[in-house]
Amino acid sequence: IKTVVEGKMPSVYFLTGHGEKTIDENYKTFKSNLKNYNYDAKELNLTTESEVPEDAAIIVVPAPKTDFTDAETEKIERYMDKGGNLSLLLSPNDEKIIYKNIEKIMHQYGIGMDYNRVYETDSSKHVSGNKYEMMVNLVDLSQISDESAKEGLTDLTSELLQNDSIIPYMPASRSFYQYNAENASTLNICPLIETNETAYGENYGGN
């Protein structure tokens, strides 16, 4: 509707500058799908931009190899404080690095990150010969009791969660956890993807 009425498409910005994967090399299909949903896909480097652009519907951070700078963190926090959206795709990183600023942002929303790599012990639930590319479970949308959390899902996310024909596999993953942040009473935290009970995490990267 916004595209038809205002004549412009909201933009999905893929952050660059930290060794991330790129939209043209790694996310061609995703980029095409976004256009089908009337979103424009662009790249964003916050070391050169003074602020997050006003047309940003969401910032996607695809597998950064290094942490945000303090200045970048402040820009993202200002964007989030105005109701902006952020998607952190944090693949396991075997480097001895702590994502201090990325974790700072996550902690404001009651989410913690493990420095590990998840693997599946049941051979029927992972790709042959690769225990790190495992079958996972999409959370049943009907099990999300918080209506405001449901409303926060995009049409694309909701469609995926309701598609019973999808058998998702997740490669190169780390685990995350929820904890009681100071502002916990104002948050709606909802997992969307979970491993099977036969999956475990092994230490990987960090200090």
For each predicted feature, which ranges?
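Short boundary motifs at domain starts and secondary-structure transition points
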Residues: 1-8, 50, 181-182
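Acidic, S/T/G-rich, low-cysteine, solvent-exposed domains in lumenal/extracellular/periplasmic regions
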Residues: 23-207
